[in-house]
Amino acid sequence: MSTLAKIEALLFVAGEDGIRVRQLAELLSLPPTGIQQSLGKLAQKYEKDPDSSLALIETSGAYRLVTKPQFAEILKEYSKAPINQSLSRAALETLSIIAYKQPITRIEIDAIRGVNSSGALAKLQAFDLIKEDGKKEVLGRPNLYVTTDYFLDYMGINHLEELPVIDELEIQAQESQLFGERIEEDENQ
């Protein structure tokens, strides 16, 4: 497996939060200068490939994959599709997690779902069902996600407290099913 492929995979998983050279260097046990060179090669690869819709950008020291500007129109059209037909199971799972556990980071959502949620988050933001609401005060300062007023309107409620109450044990059981694990309840309960 090449260094470029490893970096590309980490950039994909990092999603819109991006990943810093220092983090890549630590994860891949490579010097930062080698990571910088590889990032340059990857950026050139995307730039030169007419069959790729991706580009590599750096913002505030974090690198992330984005779509090339010439794809903006088609992506805008895609995001205009009716919500009822366009929210995948992954997007609905992600929206439910945010609704009940907000504010929450993408990494925390990924931990619950067991898979990367960047695509689902982007779609939910495009539909204005969620928004970024500050940064978590931890290493890397990841974005915090919350639901929007439009989400409340869409759900037909005025406050989050009006969401159906879900038993915490039920949530844990559902989370465990996502991971393929089983929760064994205590016989005394």
From Swiss-Prot:
Any Pfam family the entry gives: SMC_ScpB
Keywords per UniProt: Cell cycle, Cell division, Chromosome partition, Cytoplasm
Keyword Cell cycle: yes
Compartments it resides in: Cytoplasm
Cellular component GO terms, alphabetical: cytoplasm
Major place of residence: cytoplasm
UniProt record, GO biological process: cell division; chromosome separation; DNA replication
Keyword Coiled coil: no
Function statement: Participates in chromosomal partition during cell division. May act via the formation of a condensin-like complex containing Smc and ScpA that pull DNA away from mid-cell into both cell halves.
Subunit organization: Homodimer. Homodimerization may be required to stabilize the binding of ScpA to the Smc head domains. Component of a cohesin-like complex composed of ScpA, ScpB and the Smc homodimer, in which ScpA and ScpB bind to the head domain of Smc. The presence of the three proteins is required for the association of the complex with DNA.
Family: Belongs to the ScpB family.
PANTHER family: SEGREGATION AND CONDENSATION PROTEIN B
Name the UniProt record assigns to this protein: Segregation and condensation protein B
Organism the protein comes from: Streptococcus pneumoniae (strain P1031)
Lineage: Bacteria, Bacillati, Bacillota, Bacilli, Lactobacillales
Originating gene: scpB
